[in-house]
Amino acid sequence: MKIVKDLEDENNRVAASDPGTVTALGVVRAFLKNHPVMCYGGTAINDLLPKEDQFYDPKVDVPDYDFFSKTPQAHSVIIANQLKAHGIKAVEVKPGMHIGTFKVFADYTGVADITHLDDVIFDRLWKEGEVRNKIHYVPVNFLRMSMYLELSRPRGDVSRWEKVYKRLTLLNEAHPVTCKKDPQTERTELTEQQQKGVIRLLRSEPVVLLGVSSAQIHLNQVWTTPIGLLADGPTIERLTAGEKTEVFEESDILPKRTTVLDSAGKKTLFRFYETTACHSYHKMQNGVKVASIPTALQFFFAYMYSGAHEEKLASVLCIAQRLVEIANAKPERRFAVLTPKECIGTQESFTEMKRDKAELLLELSKNKSSKEYLEYFFTYNPDDKAGKKKVKKQLQTLKETTPEETSRSSK
């Protein structure tokens, strides 16, 4: 209804012009220009689009600043103190819904969401990121990955799909996926007998074809090794039992993965990825389950920031470029529906997330001065004098590296 839209715009315009909100957002923008953080999310997408394509109207919309930081607790304290210094009365830092995210509130309105990102991945993104008006943004391909991730999860918040797809289309038009060349990566074609064996596996087990293998289905190409597969943890353990394997633990952007090697232990035959949500797939007439284009692209773009060799990244980017072209051209797609309802894995519900977080809080609250507690449940209020004295010690605790962490980082 037009009257509803008009009333919403009027209310939003009042909120956007509120002096306190204008001041608070000015403080956040100034912080972004002067600290090593990277914006992502809707505001980042909007800011990287041409003016005529931007979907946020500064007169109507209050920006939602989401950004990555190596030290979100310390950065949230800086913003909170600056907000207080600029006359904002009620300022507070609280843990966000997602573990590792901290929300800064100014007069009870959220003005910044700061999320921790692993140092190694942060540095990779920083190196390839975009800079506009002194503000750093994650690379465009990382933004693409985040949107394909949402579109690949039919058990997630599907109410956002239309908005996400529109933004993705605008971003792809403004910043097309390009690869400098199509390198001839050495891959071995499967024999007819080998392909039949893989098909039997895909038909009889709860496993989905992923990665280059799934792209070859969408692009009608010959199958090659290594075969990429998606399955839950117990299935992967069962199928790889007794095989020569290498296991790579999960990171902030890629799940745990297990590679199956040949008898000599030199060549990778299969690469299993563990499910982290309910990832969409298509079921072919022969019973083979193949990852949807959004699922495949989400993993492709995540792989780009996993530390893989440059020549492998070039090959992956060229495949991703072709998949994006196919996704945007319905007549060329092998499957009419971009994201099907069928999916593999378990999608954690909002209620389950809240329950898990509450259980973690209960456990870590036994020692509120511990590093683990502060990493997940740090809070700060500049009006709390006792808290202000305590925060320096807390931030110092967060800087300290335990022997276990040193051991993990050296592996």
Where do the protein language model's features map onto the residues?
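N-terminal regions immediately upstream of nucleotidyltransferase
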Residues: M1-T23, R132-K196, E359, K371-Y373, ...
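Conserved catalytic core of two-metal-ion nucleotidyltransferases
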Residues: N81-D123, G242-N286
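Long, C-terminal catalytic modules of enzymes
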Residues: F301-Y303, E311-I344
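Phosphate-handling catalytic interfaces
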Residues: G129-M147, G287-G307
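Short, solvent-exposed beta-strand/turn patches at coil↔beta or beta↔helix junctions
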Residues: K127-E128, R153, D157, Y273, ...
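Eukaryotic intrinsically disordered, low-complexity regulatory regions enriched in Ser/Thr/Pro
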Residues: T178-Q184, K330-E405
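Amphipathic alpha-helical segments
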Residues: P72-H86, D232-K244
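Active-site nucleotide-donor binding segment shared across nucleotidyl transfer reactions
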Residues: T21-Q73, E192-R238
